[in-house]
Amino acid sequence: MPSLAQLAGLSAWLAAAMTVVGMVTLLLFFSRGGRWGAVNDASSVVLMLALIPVALVLAVIQLEVVTTTALVVAAIGIAAMLAVAVLQALLVLRRVTYDQTKAAVLGGTAVLGVWYLLTALVSGSTAVPDGIRIAGAAAGIGFIVAGYGFAVGGERHPAAAAGWLVAFVATLVFQAWLGWLLLTRNLVVPDWNA
């Protein structure tokens, strides 16, 4: 049976792959429309669910330093991940429309940005490398700025475009690097069952 670290490492890589799929299909959807929206929504469901083991393993690492704070940060992130996954799944299943979920998905994505930012801050005294923390902070800021830009001016607003670009690059770095460290066992994850 794989350890939490191995599961989280694989999940981080899956999240990185879905980030690429999501960005490409989002661009295709906004430029061409059609089925690309459904593909983007489906990739978002997988991405959000893949991030849950990542949030859990980071909480385990953070618990060595900041107990209650680590649990609160993980709860914020997992709640946002589940909310966005459910909303996007309902969209894929055509139970709701894009207009019905847009505000809630943007809000959930902004909360996801808060999770990335808080994770970067809370991981300061842990074994998580500074580069991953910086990427997490950049991703968090990117998601928050993108949500703001989208809310005030739509997908073509400069803040939305800049925020998505920063979030895209930063989350790729965060997910791919963290996944590699977890899978190669180059990041210490406490094992309380030893």
Residue ranges of model-derived segments:
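Hydrophobic, aromatic-enriched alpha-helical segments typical of multi-pass transmembrane helices
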Residues: 1-194
